[in-house]
């Protein structure tokens, strides 16, 4: 029997999908700080996957993790985004800063 170690946060249906394939998996429910840290790790993982394969599905994975982080931290992302845009703008003008002289 081959055992693969993952030690990472997975989507809710992954354990059932694995078991439906006749395999066994070992999971636990992450709570509090462990869950928040694993969400941060997952955000990096999903962002890297999007970087390597920019498509709607990969970006949706990033968004799913962002939504989970927003929920566990009770952050109002729309308010934070609007504040940041009012102060510094968005990316609509597509400016690329090349240099600054002092």
Residue ranges and their predicted role:
Residues 1-102:
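Flexible "arm" and connector segments at domain edges
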